[in-house]
Each structure stands twice: as C-alpha cells, then as structure tokens.
C-alpha cells in the first residue's frame, strides 16, 4: 500500500514522532505528554476513537530515521483536528486509569 492509496481512501498518515519526539524540531506536533506511551497504547486508543488504524511497516519518518512505521487513520475534518482528538484521548486515558504508572 502506497501513501497515494491512503489519500484515495480519505486517510491521513500519523507518524509516531508526532507523539514520541522530545522536541518539536524532531517532529513532535502536539504538547508534550507527561508520560511515555507505547505503540500498542496508541493503536488501541485509535481503535477506541473509531479511526480504524492501519500500521504500515518499513516506512521511515524523514526527520528521524529510527522510526520505521506509520499509522494511517480515517480523516476527521483536518489533520490537525484529528491529531488534537488523539492527543486529548491519550491524556484522558492515562488520567482516568490510575492503575498505570506514570
């Protein structure tokens, strides 16, 4: 599956660096999350939001070559709006679940 195919399916690309990177210059697009999130936690949150995530391996993020996968999700309004929905869900998930350690 190519990135062009994703546009035809009305999907956007979410790189893990948007959430995992320590600085904005390295790719983080949102406010810092005060805890480390795992890829599985990110994918499960996307499923809960109904964004139908597809993990695509062997795709490298241009700013950080260590990241070798991307996540394609259904587009909701704009990319920035979709990222904010995901960020708010990640922040709310950790706050409402006290069993997970910070």
UniProtKB/Swiss-Prot annotation:
GO cellular component entries: signal recognition particle
Presence of keyword Iron: no
Function: Involved in targeting and insertion of nascent membrane proteins into the cytoplasmic membrane. Binds directly to 7S RNA and mediates binding of the 54 kDa subunit of the SRP.
Gene3D superfamilies given in the database record: Signal recognition particle, SRP19-like subunit
Protein known as: Signal recognition particle 19 kDa protein
Coiled coil segments of this chain: none
Keywords: Cytoplasm, Ribonucleoprotein, RNA-binding, Signal recognition particle
Residues annotated as transmembrane: none
One MF term in the entry's GO annotations: 7S RNA binding
Biological process terms in GO annotation: SRP-dependent cotranslational protein targeting to membrane
Protein family according to the UniProt entry: Belongs to the SRP19 family.
Cell compartments where the protein resides: Cytoplasm
Subunit structure of this chain's protein: Part of the signal recognition particle protein translocation system, which is composed of SRP and FtsY. Archaeal SRP consists of a 7S RNA molecule of 300 nucleotides and two protein subunits: SRP54 and SRP19.
Pfam family, one: SRP19
Organism: Saccharolobus solfataricus (strain ATCC 35092 / DSM 1617 / JCM 11322 / P2)
């Amino acid at each position: 599956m190519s990135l062009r195919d994703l546009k035809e399916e009305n999907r956007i690309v979410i790189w893990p660096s948007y959430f995992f990177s320590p600085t904005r210059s390295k790719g983080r697009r949102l406010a810092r999350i005060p805890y480390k999130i795992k890829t599985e936690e990110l994918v499960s949150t996307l499923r809960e939001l109904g964004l139908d995530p597809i993990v695509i391996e062997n795709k490298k993020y241009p700013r950080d070559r260590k990241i070798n996968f991307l996540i394609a999700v259904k587009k909701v309004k704009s990319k920035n709006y979709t990222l904010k929905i995901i960020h708010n869900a990640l922040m709310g998930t950790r706050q409402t679940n006290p069993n997970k350690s910070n």
